[in-house]
A protein has these predicted regions:
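Short, flexible loop segments at boundaries between secondary-structure elements
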Residues: 131-147
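Single conserved hydrophobic/aromatic residue that forms the stacking wall/gate
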Residues: 2-13, 373-376
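A short alpha->loop->secondary-structure connector
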Residues: 123-133
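Short cysteine clusters
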Residues: 7, 112, 210-213
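Glycine-rich phosphate-binding "P-loop"
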Residues: 66-90
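Long, compositionally biased charged/polar accessory segments in the mid-to-C-terminal portions
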Residues: 51-52, 157-372
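Electropositive, gly/pro-rich neighborhoods at or near active sites that engage anionic ligands
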Residues: 11-38, 43-45, 371
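Gly/Ser/Thr-rich loops at beta-strand to alpha-helix junctions
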Residues: 33-37, 60, 107-117, 137-139
């Protein structure tokens, strides 16, 4: 298949990408971002120049659409992963209109979406920077909505806030934070979340095209590729990896390199060899594996069964098969970690105990390893 975005663009894409590990210097931005906050750094530069930034946002019903504006207030909605198929209806036309009127534009989307934008625009624009990300696969909005309905039924309250990859329990826990109207808070980790485990474990939630993705590898269609830098602990020091999220940045074109130079004052970065990034980011070059369950049966059941029954039939969570040794280990780990985090500060020690054992609004489980720590 022809993966070139269009004829006549010239050689604007380099086959060899320059790779960097990076984090935003603003700790609040980094904490609120999916990884290290690099998309925010890029977006902030565009806003500063009076330009427009486009990407995926949650709608009120937690469906996802592509959106663009020149208002920095929208950055909080644009940053962070959504993990869902987004509706890009009308988005490409609006981008073209802005570009033709001379506006500076930075857009972000999946590799297939950004390749489609390249093809739609026909030519490259000097006032356009395209960002994509290393994509494992996009998930079904229908599955996600059923998951949210299940949570609302379980907690008897409407969801008023949802954030994937919340970092209160650490970047590597892949925690979804869910806040309900009745003030209850759920921290759903990679070991407890039916949505995360279904996505990463069964691989049945994604689009059929994701199992044979035509936009893996090189050349990249975007000027810049961003991602979680999984495996950062093996290549960078604690200055860039303290479990708060580290970004991998791939500079795929001269335009991408030049734009990256303009944000260096707002980030901490280190150039890393290309070979070092593949171990934790196989999705850069490899399509999603085929589902581990019958996909046809799964979606037929999705139309007729409650989500909790779907989960019981198709999804096996690690916490559902905890041994007594694992439970004991989790309890001991909790006691050790709160002592370390509290730094032998007795009031803070009891604060951690209270949050995890006696706070009704916070749903944690010590024996299951789902914990919440507060620091001084």
């Amino acid at each position: 298949r022809d993966r070139s975005p269009s004829r006549g663009l010239g050689d604007v894409y380099k086959r060899q990408s320059e790779c960097h590990a990076a984090i935003h210097k603003n700790i609040e931005v980094r904490f609120d971002s999916t990884s290290g906050g690099l998309f925010s750094a890029l977006a902030e530069r565009t806003y500063k120049e009076g330009g427009y930034v486009g990407g995926a946002i949650f709608n009120e019903d937690y469906s996802v659409s592509h959106f663009i504006s020149n208002d920095k207030k929208d950055l909080a909605a644009l940053r962070s992963s959504k993990y869902l198929q987004s509706n890009a209806e009308g988005f490409y036309k609006l981008v073209r209109q802005l570009l033709k009127s001379g506006e500076k534009v930075l857009v972000c989307g999946t590799p297939c979406q950004m390749a489609a934008l390249r093809r739609f625009l026909v030519k490259d624009y000097d006032n356009l920077v395209i960002v994509d990300f290393i994509c494992l696969g996009v998930n079904s909005p229908k599955v996600f909505r059923k998951y949210l309905d299940y949570l609302e039924d379980r907690y008897q309250s409407k969801i008023v806030y949802f954030k994937a990859k919340n970092k209160e329990l650490g970047w590597r826990q892949l925690t979804s934070k869910v806040v309900f109207q009745n003030k209850q808070i759920l921290y759903d980790t990679k070991d407890t979340s039916f949505f995360t485990i279904g996505y990463l474990g069964t691989k049945v939630y994604s689009r059929p095209s994701c199992y044979d993705c035509q936009f893996k590898g090189f050349p990249r269609m975007a000027d810049i590729t961003v991602a979680d830098y999984w495996g950062a602990e093996h290549t960078v020091g604690k200055e860039l990896d303290n479990d708060m999220g580290t970004s991998l940045v791939m500079l795929n074109s001269q335009k991408g390199k030049s734009y990256f130079e303009t944000i260096k004052s707002t980030i901490i970065e280190k150039k890393v060899p290309f070979e070092s990034i593949l171990g934790g980011n196989r999705a850069l070059v490899q399509s999603l594996d085929a589902p581990l369950v019958d996909r046809v049966s799964f979606y037929e059941d999705l139309d007729t069964m409650p989500f909790q029954d779907i989960a019981a039939k198709y999804i096996r969570r690690p916490i559902d098969i905890l041994t007594w040794k694992r439970k004991l280990k989790n309890v001991l780990r909790f006691l050790w970690n709160i002592a370390s985090v509290s730094r032998f500060n007795l009031p803070l020690y009891w604060k951690n105990i209270r949050y995890n054992l006696f706070c009704k609004q916070v749903k944690c489980s010590i024996v299951r390893g789902c914990l919440l720590y507060t620091s001084p």
